[in-house]
């Protein structure tokens, strides 16, 4: 789930097989609360599932220190994933953070090449809709990354992000994407279909005089 809103997280966990929660500075800013306050509440809500926290430092050494600081402050363990944008220093930091024994999600990925360089991470997160917005093809990029990882037997998994509609999630799932992270609104829309609603209404009408037990 790509949200830091506690009410949304609680509701989504009632309906979906969610493995964890992803956050970034923009998502966290929507809550108008401090990082420490929001993350502490998320921890209680998700009960040991994956928690992805994005670093904001620019130098590799600072990214490592920031990752360690979050780990120690929130007493995180194997469910903690350090989100690192794939800048030049970010690539360096990915190796450093992995060597320090922490999980890594390489984020802000827009090309197959970026994903391949960052494949030492546990997850790579290509931005589907942002690619579509600049006249690129987000689904094709995800597909290329999946194919490349399979070709070279790379263990890193693809965690697609940045979705505008349900069809994008359908299409990344059909090209073998390992996981997706999406907003509350998108995940809620996945559950619905007007023909399902019509079918249920028809069943209710047809059952009105025959269900007697």
Model-derived regions, located:
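Catalytic cores of alpha/beta
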Residues: 7-15, 65-66, 93, 113-120, ...
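Active-site beta->alpha loop and helix N-cap motifs at the rims of alpha/beta catalytic domains
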Residues: 2-10, 15-18, 23-100, 128
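C-terminal alpha-helical cap/extension of soluble enzyme domains
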Residues: 149-213
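Active-site-adjacent beta->alpha loops and helix N-cap segments on the catalytic face
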Residues: 30-41, 59-65, 84-99, 110-119, ...
């Amino acid at each position: 789930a790509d949200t830091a809103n506690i009410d949304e997280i609680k509701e989504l966990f009632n309906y979906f097989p969610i493995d964890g929660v992803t956050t970034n500075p923009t998502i966290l800013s929507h809550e108008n609360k401090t990082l420490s306050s929001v993350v502490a509440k998320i921890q209680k809500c998700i009960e040991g599932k994956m928690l992805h926290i994005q670093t904001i430092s620019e130098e590799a050494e600072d990214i490592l220190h920031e990752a360690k600081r979050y780990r120690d402050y929130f007493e995180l363990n194997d469910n903690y994933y350090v989100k690192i944008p794939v800048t030049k220093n970010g690539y360096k930091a990915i190796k450093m953070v992995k060597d320090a024994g922490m999980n890594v999600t390489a984020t802000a990925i827009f090309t197959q090449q970026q994903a391949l360089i960052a494949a030492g991470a546990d997850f790579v997160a290509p931005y589907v809709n942002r690619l579509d917005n600049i006249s690129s093809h987000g689904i094709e990029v995800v597909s290329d990354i999946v194919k490349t990882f399979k070709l070279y037997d790379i263990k890193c998994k693809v965690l697609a992000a940045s979705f505008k509609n349900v069809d994008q999630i359908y299409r990344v799932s059909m090209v073998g994407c390992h996981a997706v992270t999406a907003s509350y609104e998108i995940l809620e829309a996945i559950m619905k279909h007007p023909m399902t609603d019509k079918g249920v209404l028809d069943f209710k009408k047809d059952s009105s005089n025959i269900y007697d037990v």
